[in-house]
Amino acid sequence: QDRYKKFPGDDNDAASRWTNPATISGDGNGAVGATGQATVIDCVGAGKDGENCRFWQHLRLSGFVGGDSGSWLAPQNAAGGILQAQNGALGLSALTICSTNLSGKIANAIDAQFDDGKPNTGQVRGTSNAAALNVTPTETAYVDDGGTVYVVCKTL
């Protein structure tokens, strides 16, 4: 937002700013996508190129993030999940970055390093219910049982 005065993905001048490769402009309303997306956002396939997906392409085109600047796919994390950008998640407001497919051990380490280590409070929040990103999580601790995976989100 510092360089272009707009959030990546929401930039309503993106199509004229970056023409090779081509991109799609956002609506310039100050938010990346709809508020509180209910689930993990799928950016794969035709018609799946909304602001949440274009967020990553705009960052690549601006040189802030490496990778194929023609792609709007979200980058993968080390656990095989994705990083996604959205306007609020898990009771957090404003631009939020979420990382999916994290084990309880990794989710707890991230939350403890940057916040309070509790999935339902603070500036870092997590849930094992990837279908309910639009509500505050109810879990009070991360479970490391080898099978439960989490989505962890933080407001930027």
What are these regions (language model features)?
Residues 8-156:
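Low-complexity, acidic interaction segments enriched in glycine
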